[in-house]
Amino acid sequence: EQVCCGMPALLSGDEQSADKLGRINQEIFKTETVITVCPTCNRMLAEEYELKGVRVMDAFEFLNEVSNFQLLTSNIQTRTAYHQPCHSAGTKAPEIIKAFLKASTDYQEIDDVCCGGGGLFTFKYPELSDMIGQRRMETLLLPETSNMKPVTFYVVTNCPGCMMQLEYLLSSGKQGIRVRHILNLITDAHKTGCPVPHTQE
C-alpha cells in the first residue's frame, strides 16, 4: 500500500524518513500516470521522487485532459471564488480550474494570497499563521456582498490542507461562505442531479 508522500517529514528536516517513504511509494508507482488531489503531494512526487517516465497530474487536470470537461457538470448555479494553493504555483491546475469555474458558475476573481496553512507551519507558528490567514479573509469580503445580506458562495480550492485552514478561519465569522474541494463541488452536483444551490442566509 502507498504511504504518505514524505513532504511533512522532509520539511521538518527528517530526510531519512522522507527517503524511506519515497522508496516505498516508488515501488508502487510503476505506471504511466500518478494522479493527486493535493498540490503538496503533487510537488513532492514530481520534484523529489525519481519517477522516470511517470506523469504526476492534479486530478482535475487529468479530468480535463481525458474529457475536456464533457463529463463534468456545467451550469453549477452558485457563486464561487478560487483559492490557489501555494504549491500549485507553476502548474497547469489553477488556470484549468479557473476556466471551468468561470464557464460553469458565477465566478468572482480574488487575489492569490496564502491562507497561512502550510502544513506543519500552522502548528509551529500559530500566531503568524493566523496573521497570514487574516489577509486571505480580507480578500473574501467581496464588494457585492459588503452592504447586503451575504449571498452563499463557495471558496473552491484543490488542496485539502488549504481547505482545513480556510474552514478554521471562517469558523468565527463570514457566514454564507463555504469551502469546497473542486472535486467535491462537482460530485455534489452530480449526486443531487441538479446545480449546487445558490441561496441566501
Sequence positions of predicted segments:
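Iron-sulfur cluster-binding electron-transfer modules in prokaryotic oxidoreductases
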Residues: 1-201
